């Protein structure tokens, strides 16, 4: 009896990053394109991708196998959003209007708005309200083809609220088709009840981290003026590493503060943002295993300089893309929009952008070999595009060409 449980047949093309592991530097954008193609799925895994005749011969559909007609469609790996703040309550529409009238993001933050505005709204919510809101935000991500997403805490900033957030993130992930990887962003900014960053970090390390660590897979810190400098970030990250958490850093968003050298020194999985990163930081990332996660929707939303994507690639860096979805500085839940911005503003090709939001984003989350490619043995997370060319996912700004989503081998219902 055949083990094939889903057969997607006669696709125009199946498109996937080449090889295994992250694609560095100029290798970003190396694709395997099979045209025409069929994909056989067994359970939650891809069994084969190849010419239709070969796939049908080697993986014939058995009793109960679901079949999908792929004619006129292209298959891509499910997108991986490796940097989101999707667990929050409230919004910051009023602040958006203030910025439209000329107020700066840092100015709003310094006056008690920004992150702290969302902290107040999030602290006031119940765990059930947070779970429901996170699931709603995951719906938005999935609608645009994201099948795996990192979700950070960081809008609680006290013991009970941070733990409540992490529990809500995990509960939302358990209930939702999108695979959720939780990150403890205990050092997002300093809440007003603390006198300074050093005092707050000691509180987090002593009172929050021991209970937060089992609920998370990674830890993150915002290294920036007005938030945390390198000494506090080092203290926090080294403590988190002691609990086995992978390390992430918000780095060089508004100014260079030494975050990139710290990320490389500590072997962090990623340094994210990098709008202000100079030549030394670019070279350091190019020689390291720390990925550069670029967030062009945030740069656009705040009117910041674009991160140095091509310089990072020329230096040999591992470049990934993400939405930075959050209510204040990047209210964007669409990775295809980010792919377009990566092409039009950062100078990436559509192939480079696709690889950065699949294989390399999977690497950031420690999921290389699991998601981000259409290859035998990988999880069967597959997007079907109804478009003349697979590049429409980046080319058509705001377009809606997603015909179907397969998640862990199951065809999801429309919408």
UniProtKB/Swiss-Prot annotation:
Function: Catalyzes the hydrolytic cleavage of the carbon-nitrogen bond in imidazolone-5-propanoate to yield N-formimidoyl-L-glutamate. It is the third step in the universal histidine degradation pathway.
Ligand binding (N-formimidoyl-L-glutamate): 155, 326, 328
Amino-acid positions noted as binding Zn(2+) in the UniProt annotation, renumbered to this chain: 83, 85, 250, 324
Pathway field: Amino-acid degradation; L-histidine degradation into L-glutamate; N-formimidoyl-L-glutamate from L-histidine: step 3/3
Cofactor(s) required for function per UniProt: Zn(2+); Fe(3+)
Comment on bound cofactor: Binds 1 zinc or iron ion per subunit.
Keywords per UniProt: Cytoplasm, Histidine metabolism, Hydrolase, Iron, Metal-binding, Zinc
Family: Belongs to the metallo-dependent hydrolases superfamily. HutI family.
InterPro entries: Amidohydro-rel, HutI, Metal-dep_hydrolase_composite, Metal_Hydrolase
Primary localization class, coarse: cytoplasm
GO biological process terms held by the UniProt record: L-histidine catabolic process to glutamate and formamide; L-histidine catabolic process to glutamate and formate
Protein name: Imidazolonepropionase
A Pfam family the protein falls into: Amidohydro_1
Domain of life: Bacteria
Binding positions for Fe(3+) per the UniProt entry: 83, 85, 250, 324
EC number of the protein: 3.5.2.7
Catalytic activity, reaction form: 4-imidazolone-5-propanoate + H2O = N-formimidoyl-L-glutamate
Gene name as annotated: hutI
Annotated positions binding 4-imidazolone-5-propanoate: 92, 155, 188, 253, 329
Keyword Aminoacyl-tRNA synthetase: no
Any one GO MF annotation of this record: zinc ion binding
Source organism of this protein record: Rubrobacter xylanophilus (strain DSM 9941 / JCM 11954 / NBRC 16129 / PRD-1)
One GO term describing the cellular component: cytoplasm
């Amino acid at each position: 009896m055949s083990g094939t449980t889903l057969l997607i047949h006669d696709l125009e093309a199946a498109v996937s990053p080449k090889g295994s592991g992250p694609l560095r530097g100029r290798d970003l954008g190396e694709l395997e394109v099979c045209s025409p193609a069929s994909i056989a799925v067994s359970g939650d895994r891809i069994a084969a991708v190849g010419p239709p005749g070969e796939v049908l011969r080697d993986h014939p559909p058995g009793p109960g196998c679901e079949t999908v007609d792929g004619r006129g469609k292209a298959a891509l790996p499910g997108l991986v959003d490796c940097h989101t703040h999707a667990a929050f309550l409230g919004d910051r529409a009023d602040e958006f209007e203030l910025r439209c009238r000329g107020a700066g993001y840092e100015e709003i933050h310094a006056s008690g708005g920004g992150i702290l505005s969302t902290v107040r709204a999030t602290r006031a919510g119940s765990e059930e309200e947070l779970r429901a809101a996170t699931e709603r935000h995951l719906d938005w991500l999935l609608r645009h083809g994201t099948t795996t997403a990192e979700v950070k805490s960081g809008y609680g900033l006290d013991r009970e609220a941070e733990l409540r957030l992490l529990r809500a993130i995990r509960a939302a992930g358990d209930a939702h088709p999108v695979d959720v990887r939780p990150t403890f962003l205990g050092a997002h900014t300093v809440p007003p009840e603390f006198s300074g960053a050093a005092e707050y970090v000691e509180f987090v390390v002593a009172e929050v981290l021991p209970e937060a660590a089992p609920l998370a897979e990674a830890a993150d810190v915002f290294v920036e003026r007005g938030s945390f400098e390198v000494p506090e970030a080092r203290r926090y990250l080294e403590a988190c590493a002691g609990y086995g958490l992978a390390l992430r850093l918000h780095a060089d968003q508004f100014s260079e503060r030494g975050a990139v050298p710290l990320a490389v020194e500590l072997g962090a999985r990623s340094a994210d943002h990098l709008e202000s990163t100079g030549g030394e930081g670019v070279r350091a990332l190019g020689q390291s295993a720390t990925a550069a996660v670029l967030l062009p929707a945030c740069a656009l939303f705040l009117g910041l300089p674009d991160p140095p994507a091509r310089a990072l690639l020329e230096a040999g860096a591992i470049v990934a893309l993400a939405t930075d979805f959050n209510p204040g500085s990047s209210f964007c839940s669409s990775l295809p929009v980010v792919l377009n911005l990566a092409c039009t503003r950062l100078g990436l090709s559509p192939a480079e952008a696709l690889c950065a939001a699949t294989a390399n984003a999977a690497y950031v989350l420690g999921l290389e070999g699991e998601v981000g490619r259409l290859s035998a043995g990988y999880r069967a997370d597959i997007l079907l595009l109804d478009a003349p060319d697979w590049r429409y996912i980046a080319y058509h700004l705001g377009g809606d060409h997603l015909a179907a989503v397969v998640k862990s081998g199951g065809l999801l219902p429309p919408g």
